[in-house]
A protein has these predicted regions:
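Conserved ASCE/P-loop NTPase catalytic core
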Residues: 1-218, 222, 228-232
Length: 232
């Protein structure tokens, strides 16, 4: 028996020959399997959530809490949206310390959006709910992800809400009341002006792995039981 000693380089895969292929963008082939074929259970759950008479405004999806998976779910939801592109929201008019709200008449209005699906794997309070800023006496209102998802769907990782339970409590309140109220993030520093609340309606998909789902179900047993459930 002949024993041949190999150098470590002989054991390294030859990737140089395939660099040109790796550099090419991935093109979806018309023969690629559809999402409904590969994930029929998840597809059905999304159809239930998007139904006008859905049993719940919340959906729990067991999947890795990574942006790639959240975006895949978002893409699937977009294909099912029958009202995509519908103008919703409003416009805040700020005059000194007086703020008024009117209905949106254009997508350029500061709190208007076209119904869509918004996904986020990690957010802070200002990113999710927007904020009020004051500089040299001038007041500006900044919309958050909930305003972008108004009339549509917000997809968010459970770990974000489990790590920041106050975010979850406020998000749940917004969904249940279908209204957004402006509140200070720090109770010791109240808002300098009164801001009218605005109608806000959205559905939420909470994405988490087994441990996150178990923790959430322990925290929200009733909502977890009522929510639409599926797995990726």
């Amino acid at each position: 028996m002949t024993i041949t000693k190999l150098a470590w380089r002989d054991l390294v895969p030859d990737t140089d020959s395939y660099q040109e292929i790796f550099a090419q963008p991935h093109l979806i082939d018309e023969n690629d399997p559809l999402f409904s074929d590969t994930q029929p259970r998840l597809q059905f759950a999304l159809e239930q959530l998007l139904h006008t008479r859905a049993s719940s405004s919340f959906m729990l999806a067991k999947a890795p809490e990574e942006s790639e998976y959240l975006n895949l779910i978002a893409d699937a939801a977009r294909t099912l949206q029958s009202d995509a592109g519908q103008l919703v929201g409003g416009h805040y008019e700020v005059s000194g310390h007086t703020i008024r709200l009117r209905h949106a008449v254009s997508a350029d209005d500061n709190f208007a959006t076209l119904t869509q699906v918004v996904a986020a794997d990690w957010v802070e309070a200002e990113q999710l709910f927007g904020c009020l800023r004051q500089f040299n006496g001038d007041i500006t209102l900044q919309p958050g992800l909930v305003h972008q998802a108004n009339g549509g769907i917000l997809i968010i990782s459970l770990r974000t809400l489990l790590a920041q339970p106050l975010l979850w409590m406020r998000l749940k309140n917004i969904v249940n009341r279908e209204r957004f109220d402006w509140v200070a993030f720090d109770e010791s520093r109240p808002l300098p002006v009164s801001v009218p609340s605005m109608p806000l309606k959205l559905k939420v998909i909470l994405v988490g792995e087994r441990e996150s789902l178990a923790d959430f179900q322990e925290m929200e047993p009733e909502l977890s039981e009522q929510a639409i459930y599926s797995e990726f």
